[in-house]
Amino acid sequence: MTLGYLYSKFFKRVLRGNSILNSVIAKTAKVYSGSTFYDSKLGRYSYVGYDSEVINCEIGAFCSIANGFITGGAKHPLDWVSTSPVFYNVGSGTGHHLGNLPIEKTAKTIIGNDVCIGSRAIIMQGVNVGTGAAIGAGAVVTKDVPPYAVVAGCPAKIIKYRFNDDIINKLLKSQWWLMDDKILKSIARYVNTPELFLSELEKIKSNVGGGKYKELNASRFFFFATSNSYCDRRMAA
């Protein structure tokens, strides 16, 4: 845990800002106040609600994350004599150290595209959440979540899938979340009917020939946030 991270916690709690550090945020994405967003990425049109803590996590496009979400927190060594961080080489909760033992870095959490996460849900570090999944409020997710699965509970379990296998496979194959805004605007009225949406999408792909519809150049949609103030710069290609 670095000095910058500890500063970001102070900024969030005392000044009620949204503390963003060493992260990449899409220009059309948003992290709400009271939240810590550290060593992470947030895709276009995604948002993270108030009072959330996101550490070492990659979040795709079009994700809706409610207030109080937590992922990527510190992992304490359960097989050591003590779980206290005063004995290893990260920031200590007390500000004091009795040792400097190395400890394995927390695994990165991956959240796909168009994922919906309910209020105060927790996703354990290193978990992969598939595109289109929905996480219930207060859920504790300890295992990978398949695409378009709906999970809830503690520990979270699969309740159902949002669509049948055919629709899920077609949506995943379409990768609609990579499309240019102009294309998405032209078919936005079909979002509430998956079959029509996919049908119209196929027409668009056919009209431009060979299915080579325009996809996004990610460098157009991101800026770096390397401190508590935004820095409007494009990503390297």
Where are these regions (language model features)?
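Membrane-proximal basic amphipathic "stem/tether" segments
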Residues: M1-A26, A237
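Flexible, glycine/small-residue-enriched loop-and-beta-strand segment within the central core
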Residues: F10, V14-L15, K30, F37-G43, ...
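C-terminal segments of enzyme domains that contribute to small-molecule binding surfaces
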Residues: V14, S84-I123, P155-A237
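Conserved catalytic-core motifs of eukaryotic protein kinase domains, centered on the activation segment
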Residues: K75-P77, V145, Y161-R162
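HATPase_c (GHKL) ATP-binding subdomain of two-component histidine kinases
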Residues: I117, K143, A152
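Conserved catalytic segment of ABC-fold P-loop ATPases
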Residues: G130-A133, P146-Y148
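Conserved G/P- and acidic residue-centered "switch" motifs that form tight phosphate/ATP-binding loops
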Residues: I135, G153
